[in-house]
Amino acid sequence: MIVIPAVDIRQGKCVRLSQGRADAQTVYSDDPAAMAAKWEGMGAARIHVVDLDGAFEKTPKNLGAIKKILETVKKPVQVGGGIRDLATMETYLDLGVSNIIIGTEAIRNPEMVKDACKRFPGKIIVGIDAKEGMVAVEGWTETTSVRAVDLARSFEDAGVAAINFTDIHRDGMQTGPNIEQTRAFAQAISIPVVASGGVSTIKDIKAVKTLAKDGVVGVITGRALYVGTLDLAEAVSEAMEGVDPDYNPF
């Protein structure tokens, strides 16, 4: 299992939000690229980048900051936030982004997502954010009546590289990941799952690691790294114990 540090960008700065709320923001760095380089230096296999302005405004807003990250780190960089069309995906991929994360459009326009999987094979990750098991969209501001597991199942044959599954109630709260919900979600589908939300300590990494047999191939962590309750090097060592160091689930 790989540990993927999150670099969330808002107005060019590296920030973290609590439960996706724009009014609950903490700024951790004015230089997202330097932060990405720090995580790479501590053993990150890839970097998870979110354009928060893009997520809220429905169009990419931090291309400059993301381009600088791509120029700074050598590890794969996956990007999400405000990606609503094939042209934007192509722009990111041409810049050197390894994987595109599609969230809201996965439920708004699933056919476009399936088309993207055909046009950019192995490059598309679907981000499913759940609130009490139901899909949340538009930067987590709207909860739908669609079950997260049903949305995931609809992409079973599309060629999706992975699904990032986020429990919104846990994200940015450091309350521990929802292990049972994540296990049930991963067991219900055949697509590799990356867990997200609630990781706060090495104990949580160990807990998520037990889900590897259920199809969880990675875990995204953010605030815990920034506030210091989780050491990335230790987390990577724990997650990759007994695993080929070149392991790449994507």
From Swiss-Prot:
Swiss-Prot/TrEMBL catalytic activity: 1-(5-phospho-beta-D-ribosyl)-5-[(5-phospho-beta-D-ribosylamino)methylideneamino]imidazole-4-carboxamide = 5-[(5-phospho-1-deoxy-D-ribulos-1-ylimino)methylamino]-1-(5-phospho-beta-D-ribosyl)imidazole-4-carboxamide
GO terms of molecular function: 1-(5-phosphoribosyl)-5-[(5-phosphoribosylamino)methylideneamino]imidazole-4-carboxamide isomerase activity
Enzyme class of the recorded protein, top EC level: isomerase
Pfam families: His_biosynth
Keyword S-adenosyl-L-methionine: no
Keyword terms of this UniProt record: Amino-acid biosynthesis, Cytoplasm, Histidine biosynthesis, Isomerase
Record flagged with keyword Isomerase: yes
Protein family: Belongs to the HisA/HisF family.
HAMAP family: HisA (MF_01014)
Record-given protein name: 1-(5-phosphoribosyl)-5-[(5-phosphoribosylamino)methylideneamino] imidazole-4-carboxamide isomerase
Organism: Desulfatibacillum aliphaticivorans
Phylogenetic lineage: Bacteria, Pseudomonadati, Thermodesulfobacteriota, Desulfobacteria, Desulfobacterales
